[in-house]
Amino acid sequence: MAVAFRGGRGGVGSGQSTGLRSFFSYRIFISALFSFLFLATFSVVLNSSRHQPHQDHTLPSMGNAYMQRTFLALQSDPLKTRLDLIHKQAIDHLTLVNAYAAYARKLKLDASKQLKLFEDLAINFSDLQSKPGLKSAVSDNGNALEEDSFRQLEKEVKDKVKTARMMIVESKESYDTQLKIQKLKDTIFAVQEQLTKAKKNGAVASLISAKSVPKSLHCLAMRLVGERISNPEKYKDAPPDPAAEDPTLYHYAIFSDNVIAVSVVVRSVVMNAEEPWKHVFHVVTDRMNLAAMKVWFKMRPLDRGAHVEIKSVEDFKFLNSSYAPVLRQLESAKLQKFYFENQAENATKDSHNLKFKNPKYLSMLNHLRFYLPEMYPKLNKILFLDDDVVVQKDVTGLWKINLDGKVNGAVETCFGSFHRYGQYLNFSHPLIKENFNPSACAWAFGMNIFDLNAWRREKCTDQYHYWQNLNEDRTLWKLGTLPPGLITFYSKTKSLDKSWHVLGLGYNPGVSMDEIRNAGVIHYNGNMKPWLDIAMNQYKSLWTKYVDNEMEFVQMCNFGL
């Protein structure tokens, strides 16, 4: 029983194995058959596609190109590859040649022959690029390349490339240098333009700051006037001081509308004077600031017996437009037009004339210096001081200087070719050219010792009037008092030692401290006045130490000194 059972199982397994072998053999046969058919089909298609361009000319060119790229990618033409490289070389060198030709034109080089060679070479490259053989071959339209034609084309392109390279190597250094020089010039020009603009803007800003009245100064003047109004009895005018006409004393003339500035000048003189009771100050201001000036010196009388006389321009009755040409000119329409209207002749059109826009040039206070002998007829000598100076030592030695019969004792400012008469006067005018030397050395207003007797003898005021009348149309000089001063006191000025008067503290940061320490008078000429926010800090303390900070109105007006 057991044997029969095993024999039955073995027969069934043998039948199943035979069926499986038959099935797998059939599948292998079918796979091999399909593989053979696929290879045969691919071979036929491949062979037919090789001959199709020569047999069927009715197919579109795009179809041919597509078939070529699809089935012949592995069979690229070596001539075609070389042609592409040659074409790229030609294009690159054409671009380079055109660039160097453009540089040559831009730099305006004298090598016109070289420029022409570059231009001719660029034309040759363009002609090569437009040749039918090269153009059609590069367009990839499937045309076969002839080796002879290709070699001729290749040689021609290589010759042009070689020529271009040689020319570029020869001229590269020169062109690069010239280009750098041109770029540097362009940069310098642009920077100079910016610098000029910045300087002019700075000059305008500085002028605006200089001509504007600071809030603190306005506050001080208003409070002083308010004090006068509140206490009229306290500030009645005192009788004239006999010292004002005593020729044996030391007399000073100060013409200003700036209360704090005048107080500093007077205080600096008194504090450094050996005998202050012998010093007399003649202060002249305008009608608007007269009350404020009087109240200041009433509230803060001078120490140690010094004297002060305060007047307004209007107190000198002889100063009217019929006598003083400058008053007549200041009222003229022409000068108003020159000063205020924005036309071609306006001073602001010329950066060198910006300074003439300062209101002081339209103030009679600025011209009073030419009438000193008539304003003080009983005096022999007088020291004229601007309101932007500080006196640092006793200056009575100025009265002892022998002026050799000259009218004006002043410090000369010329050095080299600077600050000569030619810079202040119009020497193209025949009258100026005939009467003055353009190389004559100029001097400075601000600290001048005047011999009034010599002035009267030389009739200097008449000379001033003569030239001022001639300059009504401003053809001899522009606005200002230094040019007419140079004319009036030409050959009548005694040069003083430079240590008496050191200038430039209002514009020149390079004035040495040694010069300043040794100076009798330091002068803040320029726009950076010490009472303004734009003052130079290194010099400001030399002025502020003479400000009367104990004065209550100075504290209330927040001078920030």
From Swiss-Prot:
Claim: Flavoprotein is one of the keywords in the record: no
UniProt membrane topology term: Single-pass type II membrane protein
Glycosylation sites: 124, 320, 346, 426
Matches recorded under Gene3D superfamilies: Spore Coat Polysaccharide Biosynthesis Protein SpsA, Chain A (3.90.550.10)
Coiled-coil ranges (or none): none
Entries under InterPro entries matching the protein: GAUT, Glyco_trans_8, Nucleotide-diphossugar_trans
UniProt note on tissues of expression: Expressed in roots, inflorescences, siliques, leaves and stems.
Keyword terms of this UniProt record: Glycoprotein, Glycosyltransferase, Golgi apparatus, Membrane, Signal-anchor, Transferase, Transmembrane, Transmembrane helix
Annotated GO MF terms: polygalacturonate 4-alpha-galacturonosyltransferase activity
Topology feature Cytoplasmic, residues: 1-27
GO biological process, one term: pectin biosynthetic process
Pathway: Glycan metabolism; pectin biosynthesis
Protein EC: 2.4.1.-
Statement: the UniProt record of this protein carries the keyword S-adenosyl-L-methionine: no
Compartment(s) of residence: Golgi apparatus membrane
Lumenal side: 49-561
GO cellular component terms attached to this protein's record: endosome; Golgi apparatus; Golgi membrane; Golgi trans cisterna; trans-Golgi network
Residue intervals passing through the bilayer: 28-48
Pfam families (UniProt xref): Glyco_transf_8
Purpose: May be involved in pectin synthesis.
Stated family: Belongs to the glycosyltransferase 8 family.
Official protein name in the record: Probable galacturonosyltransferase 9
Organism: Arabidopsis thaliana
Organism lineage: Eukaryota, Viridiplantae, Streptophyta, Embryophyta, Tracheophyta
Gene: GAUT9
